[in-house]
Design a protein with these regions (language model features):
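N-terminal Rossmann-like NAD(P) cofactor-binding subdomain of oxidoreductases
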Residues: 1-183, 218-220, 284-285, 289-295, ...
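Charged docking surfaces used in two-component/phosphorelay signaling
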Residues: 66, 155-329
Length: 329
């Protein structure tokens, strides 16, 4: 399988290369792709050295699969060019997610909808993935009426500049700012730009993408997204109201049996999800399950995942694995 990684020198791109190796993805030829300033650089992967190429060169090489993590503008311009030569593109940006003609895929939930005709496939937002993976089996059983989510998001979701800003501030060094305010010892209630309704793009991604992935626009979702000085992963406080009542132990059993979820919910041993322990892992961790005593049929939970892995790179490669296994590429 000829695989191009677009944005190979970026934070998510580097993790994608790592995950491809870890999961023994059937790569016969690797094509690392990056911006012009990185073209010609060499990267090591699986014991071999590869030269970084530009986008046009990569298109001409006609890869079977192109894994994109290079921003929305690059995806909008170049994903169709790859698709035209027969490449299947799996894109990490928000560029194609809400396009009605494109699938928005979390493999454990809706990979079976994919066909050979799907040449541009959208990977959901990191904070959406961990939430919908948890919600999907519960929606199937109890039907979700409303979701209230507050996110506590890792600076790695912003990128290398944000990590550098935190390190600079921690060490008392002046440097380039990824955020409009200090992030060290702070919480910034703005992830991405504001939309006309007063919500950020990140908050509205949680609303729109959840409805699309779960294929149910009747689910009411409201979100608040906060950036915090953490690197291990995103955390979410999620309040879910069902149409039907539930038993807490049944919810635990459903989540325990759901592929990709690790239940960490033992108050006696103070066991619950935390980003410092989610870092570097592919599962979504769920805990602090408790009945909402303020209204019926409602549960509170705490969801944590490594936003660079299941929230980005791993989910992308799981989609690619599904395509290969089912001979869709």
């Amino acid at each position: 399988m000829k695989v191009a990684v677009v944005g190979a020198t970026g934070m998510v791109g580097e993790i994608m290369l790592k995950v491809l190796a870890e999961r023994n993805f059937p790569v016969t030829e690797l094509i690392p792709v990056a911006s012009e300033k990185s073209v010609g650089k060499e990267i090591e992967w699986n014991g071999k050295s590869y030269k970084v190429v530009g986008l046009q060169t990569a298109v001409e090489m006609r890869p079977d699969i192109a894994l994109f993590s290079a921003g929305g503008e690059t995806s909008l311009e170049w994903a169709p060019k790859f698709a035209e030569v027969g490449t299947t593109v799996i894109d990490n940006s928000s560029a194609w997610r809400m396009d009605p003609s494109k699938k928005l895929v979390v493999p454990e939930i809706n990979a079976t909808s994919l066909t050979k005709e799907d040449k541009i496939i959208a990977n959901p937002n990191c904070s959406t993935i961990q939430m919908v993976l948890t919600l999907a089996p519960l929606h199937a059983k109890y039907k979700i009426k409303r979701v209230v989510v507050s996110t506590y998001q890792s600076i790695t979701g912003t990128g290398v500049k944000a990590v550098q800003q935190l390190e600079n501030e921690y060490n008392g060094v002046k440097g380039e700012m990824a955020y409009p305010y200090p992030i060290h010892r702070n919480a910034i209630p703005q992830c991405d730009v504001f939309e006309e309704n007063g919500y950020t793009k990140e908050e509205m991604k949680l609303v729109r993408e959840t409805q699309k992935i779960l294929n149910d626009k009747t689910i009411a979702v409201t979100a608040t997204a906060i950036r915090i000085p953490v690197v291990g992963g995103h955390s979410e406080a999620v309040n879910v109201q069902f149409e039907n009542d539930y038993e807490l132990n049944d919810i635990r059993q459903i989540l325990h049996n759901t592929s990709g979820i690790t239940l960490q919910d033992n108050l006696d041993t103070k066991t619950y999800p935390m980003p410092i322990y989610a870092e570097g892992k592919d599962d979504v961790f769920v805990g602090r399950l408790r009945r909402d005593e303020s209204q019926p049929n409602t549960i509170n939970m705490w969801i944590v995942a490594d936003n660079l892995r299941k929230g980005a790179a791993t989910n992308t490669i799981q989609i690619a694995e599904y395509l290969v296994t089912n001979k869709l590429v």
